[in-house]
Amino acid sequence: MKKLKVSKMEILVRYGEIGLKSDPIRKNLEEILRKNIIKLLRKYEIDAEVKILHRKLLVKINTKDKEDLALKLLKKVAGIVSYSPVYECPLDINEIVSFAVQIMKKKLKTLNKEKVTFAVKTKRSYKKFPFTSVEVNKKVGEAIVEKLGLEVDLENPDIVLGIEILNDGAYIFTEKYEGIGGLPAGSQGKVLCLISDGIDSPVAAFMMIRRGCRAVLLHLKMSEEALNKVRKIVEVLSDYDTELEFVVYDYKKDIEDIVEKLKSIKKENYTCIFCKRKMLKVAEKYAKYLDCDAIVTGDNLGQVASQTLKNLRVISENINYPILRPLIGLDKNDIVKIAKEIGTYEISTEKEIKCPYLPKHPKTIAKPEEVKKIKEKVKLV
């Protein structure tokens, strides 16, 4: 029997809906995912080899002392559903049993507990392996009970020993980390995301990256303070999309022009409406120039004055690009939860920067005909 020796960490990566695609599309998505893993690890000076297996990927970490960092980074790769540090062994039932016992013995040393229970869960993707999943579970479980004296608990075990039988070997593990799921970034086109220092827009950008888009983040600058916060947010999001682009447009003159013109006709309550219309017009120009396929905003229905359904209609009416609003139906608590999980919440809330141009009584139900009259009267977009 071979002794358990590990010189380099190996991580088995699992994907979800990629596996539902046709073979040509699946293979293309697997390759994009493979490259995205390598790019993110290289960003942190981690050398790795990524091999495509049967509906899974295997990541071999070549840089010592950065294995824990590599495990954290894989959490940020869109397309990964789960992953596990694994021990690889030959497709031989005796070798699998031997490796499993050694792995469990090693795992026990990390637990400060007298009575330890376990369960064995095998997935046999390689159907030519002569033992079924149930038979592997039984043989491995019996050996662990006999040699280590542990008790089986299939309902709530302290340790779950996982075994994946693939056509090139068996992969055994005791840890399973959750990924963010979705599709590999870059597989579904490019979007232009309006980004501010608030909670919502970074989450909207993340959700589009998770669905396979490359993102261009456009910040409409109104203050240096807000821009500095946005730069920190962009740095966080750049882990989720290693090809992320960031663009800054000086918006202060535009908003001041809007406010001045609306004041001249005593229609200051329409400030948010015309501000958002102008923002989308600027976004549309950048989207065309940068060859993006859609515009993304952090709008959440009913959250603020400009995000009522009536207002969203008049805000969007003169834009010829698709406008995607991934947060539109979420509760605020759901958005906050995602922001905390992806690492942008603390930055967004470190100091609230209120909009100095917000009117006392913003218009919540704007009529298209009224907006048209104002637009034509003071020459706004």
Curated annotation (Swiss-Prot):
GO BP field: thiamine biosynthetic process; thiamine diphosphate biosynthetic process; thiazole biosynthetic process; tRNA 4-thiouridine biosynthesis
Record bears the keyword Acetylation: no
Keyword entries, A-Z: ATP-binding, Cytoplasm, Nucleotide-binding, RNA-binding, Thiamine biosynthesis, Transferase, tRNA-binding
Pfam families cross-referenced by the UniProt entry: ThiI (PF02568), ThiI_fer (PF22025), THUMP (PF02926)
Catalytic activity, as annotated: [ThiI sulfur-carrier protein]-S-sulfanyl-L-cysteine + a uridine in tRNA + 2 reduced [2Fe-2S]-[ferredoxin] + ATP + H(+) = [ThiI sulfur-carrier protein]-L-cysteine + a 4-thiouridine in tRNA + 2 oxidized [2Fe-2S]-[ferredoxin] + AMP + diphosphate; [ThiS sulfur-carrier protein]-C-terminal Gly-Gly-AMP + S-sulfanyl-L-cysteinyl-[cysteine desulfurase] + AH2 = [ThiS sulfur-carrier protein]-C-terminal-Gly-aminoethanethioate + L-cysteinyl-[cysteine desulfurase] + A + AMP + 2 H(+)
The EC number(s) this enzyme carries: 2.8.1.4
Molecular function GO terms recorded: ATP binding; CCA tRNA nucleotidyltransferase activity; tRNA binding; tRNA-uracil-4 sulfurtransferase activity
A cellular-component GO term for this protein: cytosol
Pathway: Cofactor biosynthesis; thiamine diphosphate biosynthesis
Binding site for ATP: 194-195, 276, 298, 307
Enzyme class: transferase
SUPFAM superfamilies: Adenine nucleotide alpha hydrolases-like, THUMP domain-like
Listed HAMAP family: ThiI (MF_00021)
Family statement: Belongs to the ThiI family.
PANTHER family associated with the record: TRNA SULFURTRANSFERASE
Function: Catalyzes the ATP-dependent transfer of a sulfur to tRNA to produce 4-thiouridine in position 8 of tRNAs, which functions as a near-UV photosensor. Also catalyzes the transfer of sulfur to the sulfur carrier protein ThiS, forming ThiS-thiocarboxylate. This is a step in the synthesis of thiazole, in the thiamine biosynthesis pathway. The sulfur is donated as persulfide by IscS.
Name by which UniProt lists this protein: Probable tRNA sulfurtransferase
Lineage: Archaea, Methanobacteriati, Methanobacteriota, Methanomada group, Methanococci
Gene from which the chain derives: thiI
